[in-house]
């Protein structure tokens, strides 16, 4: 049962091959057995899961099943879940129980999906390796010495290890695509505003976007259909029609114009990763697509621009955690200032504190123009690069990450090296366009992802292009040893 994809589970449930309760029990048993190995799930919710599965079985019996009814998943612990701890991977929110459901959680529950639990993540989504979590690092099922990527590392490891057929994630600078690449999964960052951010704990509000993680593009199409849509409770949500993403999955890629940016194949790209990605792009040429070199000249500024804008927005968003209203509160403060200082000092981890300090500095009176304003101006240039390129080509392809998964502890002392893990994904968030990562092979025995970038609200095309690759390859069907 655990080998089936979301689409296969949904079809089997509707055909009566097994019940939602049976499939839910099977995944809960795998979480019990394998979670101690990966540390992917920090809050299992077996009671709620079985109740939701029974309700789904009733819907199926009544002939009221939708395309996702009865299918289990895990939610990244950044999404508020009513009555269930929502920690965001931080000591600051270790005791926080959300009083309401995030829109994404509510929509998928309404679609009949079954929440198995909450997935581990980098603290406040700040990290590329899932090593900043208060609950300890997550291990990559493909190699337990390796990181799963971040910040949605728990979501990625849970799906790769077959603890769940699907997961939600969030992507601020690559946090869905990079862990999907490092764990051999399919992961989609939708267009900014496509998926509601209501109830999704904020890191950098102009960059954050929720999205699905699963093994196939067909599964992502089903999940995005359940997640996407306008929400009046999120001022950045866009009122744009939600198509049936599964309808166009099988379109031919003959004549598709694929742009390959020379900037994504320069210094810093592991030669083996490069070979795998080039071979994947070659598959499209064989399928009748047209490949042309393009240039995205300003994307080389993505890392410095991102590390001004994202920390600036984070320092503002995280100012709400003060030890007064909710979250961690220090013991016996001597006065209000001591309460603020110690609650924040003890409640936040090192990486979060580093980014708050960087962001506060970038926003401070004497430096605002030199840093924050300048970064926003360069961000516009990056966006213009994509707009120009996507007028000439249909999609853009390149590596998702410059290397395969690195070992746990290998980059913790070198923040800049860690930040460069997202060098190919950051520009997509800065521009707000959608990006997809699909499994394209292995290098040094660890998975490699192919990144496919499209125009605003063109997720259907990305999923179609990814699906066509998965029809002629079987990288998405590989299983990590010990998790069969």
Curated annotation (Swiss-Prot):
GO terms (BP aspect): translation
A GO MF label: glutaminyl-tRNA synthase (glutamine-hydrolyzing) activity
Catalytic activity field: L-glutamyl-tRNA(Gln) + L-glutamine + ATP + H2O = L-glutaminyl-tRNA(Gln) + L-glutamate + ADP + phosphate + H(+)
GO cellular component, one term: glutamyl-tRNA(Gln) amidotransferase complex
Keywords: ATP-binding, Ligase, Nucleotide-binding, Protein biosynthesis
Enzyme Commission number, as recorded: 6.3.5.7
Biological role: Allows the formation of correctly charged Gln-tRNA(Gln) through the transamidation of misacylated Glu-tRNA(Gln) in organisms which lack glutaminyl-tRNA synthetase. The reaction takes place in the presence of glutamine and ATP through an activated gamma-phospho-Glu-tRNA(Gln).
Entries under PANTHER family matching the protein: GLUTAMYL-TRNA(GLN) AMIDOTRANSFERASE SUBUNIT A, TRANSAMIDASE
NCBIfam families listed in its UniProt record: gatA (TIGR00132)
Stated name of the protein: Glutamyl-tRNA(Gln) amidotransferase subunit A
Protein's organism: Alkalilimnicola ehrlichii (strain ATCC BAA-1101 / DSM 17681 / MLHE-1)
């Amino acid at each position: 049962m655990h080998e089936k994809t979301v689409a296969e589970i949904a079809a089997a449930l509707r055909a009566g091959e097994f019940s939602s309760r049976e499939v839910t029990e099977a995944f809960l048993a795998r979480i019990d057995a394998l979670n101690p190995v990966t540390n992917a799930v920090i809050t299992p919710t077996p009671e709620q899961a079985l109740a939701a599965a029974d309700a789904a079985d009733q819907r199926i019996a009544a002939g009221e099943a939708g395309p996702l009814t009865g299918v289990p998943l895990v939610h990244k612990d950044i999404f508020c879940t009513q009555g269930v701890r929502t920690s965001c991977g931080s000591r600051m929110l270790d005791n926080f129980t959300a009083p309401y459901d995030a829109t994404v959680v509510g929509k998928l529950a309404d679609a009949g999906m079954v929440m198995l639990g909450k997935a581990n993540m980098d603290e406040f989504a700040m990290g590329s390796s899932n090593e900043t979590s208060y609950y300890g690092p997550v291990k990559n099922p493909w190699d337990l010495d390796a990181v799963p990527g971040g910040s949605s590392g728990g979501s990625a490891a849970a799906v790769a290890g077959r603890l769940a057929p699907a997961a939600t994630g969030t992507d601020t600078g690559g946090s869905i695509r990079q862990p999907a690449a490092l764990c051999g999964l399919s992961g989609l960052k939708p267009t900014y505003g496509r998926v509601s951010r209501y109830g999704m704990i904020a890191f950098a509000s102009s960059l954050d976007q929720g999205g699905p993680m699963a093994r196939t593009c067909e599964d992502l199409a089903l999940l995005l259909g359940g997640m996407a849509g306008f929400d009046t409770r999120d001022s950045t949500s866009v009122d744009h029609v939600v198509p049936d993403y599964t309808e166009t999955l099988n379109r031919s890629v003959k004549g598709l114009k694929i742009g390959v940016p020379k900037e994504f194949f320069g210094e810093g790209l592991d030669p083996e990763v490069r070979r795998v990605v080039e071979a994947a792009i070659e598959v499209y040429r064989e399928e009748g697509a047209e490949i042309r070199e393009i240039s995205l000249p300003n994307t080389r500024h993505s890392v410095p621009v991102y590390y001004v804008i994202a920390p600036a927005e984070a320092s503002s968003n995280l100012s709400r955690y003060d030890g007064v209203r909710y979250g961690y509160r220090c013991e016996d403060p001597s006065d209000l200032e001591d309460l603020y200082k110690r609650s924040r000092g003890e409640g936040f981890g090192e990486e979060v504190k580093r980014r708050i300090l960087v962001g506060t500095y970038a926003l401070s009176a004497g430096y605002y123009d030199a840093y924050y304003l300048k970064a926003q101006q360069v961000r516009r240039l990056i966006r213009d690069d994509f707009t120009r390129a996507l007028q000439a080509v249909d999609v853009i392809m390149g590596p998702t990450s410059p290397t395969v998964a690195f070992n746990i502890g290998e980059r913790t002392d070198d923040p800049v090296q860690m930040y460069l893990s997202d060098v190919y994904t950051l520009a997509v968030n800065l521009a707000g366009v959608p990006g997809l990562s699909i499994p394209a092979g292995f290098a040094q025995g660890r998975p490699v992802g192919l990144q496919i970038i499209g125009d605003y609200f063109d997720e259907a095309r990305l999923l179609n292009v990814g699906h066509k690759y998965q029809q002629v390859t079987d990288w998405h069907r590989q299983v990590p040893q010990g998790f069969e």
